[in-house]
C-alpha cells in the first residue's frame, strides 16, 4: 500500500516542478516583453520629439528661403525695369544727337548761303514803305510782347517730358517746309528759288553771329526799323495761316515752347554784354505788329513801339540778296513762317479770327529793316524787358482792319517814296550789321523818315517803355498771391503809390482803343488789409462795388488826351478810396452800435432776472457777469432739503421728559446760514428763494397745528407717541410724566383737551429752550411712526368709543361710576411692520386689529379717592398689565365672542404702567383648574400687544372697582390657529411700537366725575355695538391691603396667579394685580435666562422657570391671599363676585399647548 502512495508523491512532485519551471519561464518572458515594450515606447517617444524638432527647423528654413526667393524676384523685376528705362534713354539720346547734328549742318549752310538774299530783300523795302501811311489813326493796335527764351546755343534738354515733343516738332518743321515749297507760284519753277526758301527756313533756326550780337547789345544804339512791303503771290493758299494758327493754339506749355526753339524757332545765344537775348519781330499780314521785350519799335502809322533783333536784320539782308524774280513769293512765305515761330514764344496767345488771317492777292507783308539811333534810349530798353502784354481784341478792331486793307489797296507808292526820301535827307544812312557801307548798291537801308514821324516815334517809345514798367509792376503784383498779398482794385496802397509818383499815369498809360475798358490791379498788404477790410462781409460788398465801378471808364479820347484820362482815373480812384473808407467806418460804427445795444439789452435782462426770477437765475454767457448764482441756488436747495424733516413738530424727551420743537429753530437758523455763505452778495437776493420755501413750510406747520386742533386727541396723542423715542436709552428708569398728564375729558368737545395739551407742550418748549434736538435717525423713525399712526388713529378712536359705550350700556351703575372716575385717553398703536401670517379664513388681520382696539380701550381700573391717603407713593413702580380677550371660534373677521370680558386692574397712586408686548408665539389659555374660594380666575381674552422698547416707558391703566372677594387670574393660552391672527406690535425684524396711556388724575373732584358720567352716557347712546362686552372688575387694592402695606402678607395682597409665557427676542407684557409695589424687569434673549426683579413689598410672588424647550417662559404666580380690609365697599364686592362666576364657564377654553412644559406649568 505504501508503493502506490510513494509513486503518487513522486509524480505530483515532478508535475509541480514542471509547472513551476514553466511558470518561471513565462514570467521571465513576460518581464522581458514588458521591458522591450517599454524601451520601444521610450525610443518612439524620443523619435517623435526629434522628428517634431526637425520638422520645425525645416519649416523655418523653408520660410526663410521663400522670403529670400521673393525678394530676389522683386529685385530682378526692378532691375529689368531700370534696364529698359536706360535703354530707352539711350535710344532717345541717340535720336537727339542725330537731329542735332543735322540741324548744325543746316545752320552752317544757311549762314554761308543766305546772307546775300537777306540783303537784297532789305533793299526792296524802299519801294513799298509809304503804303501804310494813309491809315495811321485807324490801324492802331496794342503791341504784343513775349518773354525771352534763354536758350544757349545747341542746347538739348534730355528730359522725359520733351520726348513726345521732338517728333511733333520734326513733323511741324517738315510741314512748314512743304508748305513753303507748295506756296511758290507755278511761274517760278526754278530750284534756285526753292533752295533759298529752305535755307531761309533753316536760318530761322539759326543764331546770329557773335560779333553782330555784341555790336547790337554793346554799342548802345537803338535800331529803328522801317517796313518793306512785299506783294505775295495770288496763288497763295488760304489754309496755310489757319493751319499754322491751329498749331499755335495746340502748342504745349511755355516751358515746352522753349524746347521747340531749338528745332523750329529763331534762337539767340545769350552772351557777352547782352542782358536778354533779342527775339525776332515780324508783323502779321493783317498789320498786327508784335514787339519783343528786348527792344521797342514804333510803327509811325499805328503809333506802337516794337524792337527787332539783329537776326531780323540779317534775314532782311538775306532777303535782299535773293534774285528779283523769286524774291517776292518766298519772302512772303518766310514772313508767314517767322510769324508762326514768334507766336510760340507768347505765354498769352492772341486770338485771331479766321477771316483776319486770310491772305489775298492785295495783302502786303512787312519785313523789318534795322537802323541806328541814339544811345540813351537803350537804357529804357533794358528796363522794359521781360514783360508780356495781353492783347485784347475789340469789336472795332476788326472793322479797322478791314478799312486798313481797303486803304492799303488804294495807297500810292509815290507818297511812300517821297516820305522815304525826306527821311533820308534828315537822317544819315546807316549800314546794316554795324558795318560802314553795304557791299550791294541796293542794300541801302531805308532809314529816311519824316521829322513828324520821328518825333512821334520818340513820344510813343517813351510811353511804351513806361507802360511796360506799369505792366511789369501789375503782373508782379497780380501773381504775388495767397498768404502774403491779396489783389483788390483801388486800394489805399495803390493810391498812395500814385501820389508818391512811382509811376505817372498821365504820361505812362498805355493807349487804349475807344472800345477797350481800362483795368488796373493793385496790391494790399496784410498790414493794410485789416484796416481796409475789418469784416469779410464788408470786403465782399466793397469788392462787388468796385468791380461794378471798375468797368466804368472807357478810353474814348485820343492819344493827345491821355493826361485828361489819367487825371480822370486818378480822381475816380481817390473818390472810390473815400467811399470805401466811409463805408468801412460806417460799418464799424454800425457794428459797434449793434454790439452795444445787444450788451445793454443783455444787462437789462440780467437785472430783470436777478430782480424778478424767484426760482432760477439764468446766467448769460458773458465774461463780465458772475456765475455764482447757480451755486447759491444749489446750496440753498440743499439747506432746504435738510430742513424738510421739520415739516411737522417733532417732540423729544430727555431725562426730565421735557419736549422741544426743532422745526422753528432750524428754520430760523437757515436764514442766518444763507447770508453767511456769500457775505459780499445782497442778502435780499439770496434769501428770496429760502423765504418762499420757509413761508410754505410755515404754512404746513400751521396747517398741522390746525389739524391737531380740529382732530382733537388724535394729533395730541400723535405728538405724545414720540415722547418715548429717547427713553429707550434708559431701561429700568421710570420717568415722572406727571407734567404730561391731561385732565379728564369733561367736555363734549374733545378739541379743548387737545388745545390744553398743545399749550402744555408749548410750555415745555419754553421750559427747556437749551435742549439740543434729537439725532436725525430718531426724527426719521418718528416720521415713519407718524405716517402709520395717521392711518390708524381714527379707527382706533372709533372702536374705543364703541367699546366704552358698550361697556357703559351693559353694566350697571357701578361700571358707570367707574367710567366717571377714570381718566380715559386714547391709545395710539404704532406698528412698523404687521405680522404677515394671516389666518386661513383671510379675516385675521381685521379681527386682530379690532381685537387690539377692544383690548386697548376696554381695560380700566378704579381708584377709590377715599383710599388715596392710605397708601404711600411707590418708587419706580412697574405695573404689569395683562390684557386678554378671547376670540370666538365660530365668528370670523371682526366678530367677537360674547363671552369676552375686560380685565380691570386697580391701581392706587400709580404714575406709570408699563405694557410689554408678547411674541407671536406666545399663547394664553384660561386654565380651568380647581380653585378654592380664595382663588381668583382671570378670564382673559386674546390680545394684541403693543411693543415697548424700554421698561421706563410709562403707561397708565384705568382701574375698576371690585368687591372684596378676590378674583382668580389664570393665564390662558390660545391655540396655534388663533396665534396667527395676532398682529403683534413687535416682529423679529423691527423693534416694536410704543403704547402710551396717560395716567389717571388722582386729584379729580366729584363734580368732574359727574360731568364725565354724563359724557359717557351720551356716547353710549350714540355708539352701541356689542352688548356682551364687559370688563372684569377685580377687587380693588384699597379693600385688600391694609394701612401697613409695607409689611404686607398673604392677607394684604390680592390672591391671584400671573402666569406669563415669554419667548426669545421679545419684551414682556406683565399683568399684576392691583398691587403696585412690585417692579419686574425682564430681559429675554435666545439663550439667556430671564431676570425677574420683584419689589421687596411682594415677598409672596413665586417665579417658575421652565427650562425644557427652545423658548423660555416665566410664570409669575401671586399666591397671596386676599384679605378684605375695606368694608366700605360691600356693594362693589358683591357685584364683582356675582358677575365673575356668571362668565366663568363661557371663558373656559380647553388647553391646546404644543409644548408640554408650558402645559404642565399652566396646570400648576
From Swiss-Prot:
Polar residues: compositionally biased ranges: 238-247, 288-299, 443-472, 934-948, 1126-1140
Main localisation: nucleus
One record GO biological process: meiotic sister chromatid cohesion involved in meiosis I
Region (Disordered): 160-269, 287-314, 390-492, 521-541, 917-992, 1092-1164
Oligomeric form and interacting partners: Part of an astrin (SPAG5)-kinastrin (SKAP) complex containing KNSTRN, SPAG5, PLK1, DYNLL1 and SGO2A. Interacts with CDCA8. Interacts with PPP2CA.
Further comment found in the protein's record: Shugoshin is Japanese for guardian spirit (as it is known to be a protector of centromeric cohesin).
Name listed for the protein in its UniProt record: Shugoshin 2A
Species name: Mus musculus (Mouse)
Gene expressing this chain: Sgo2a
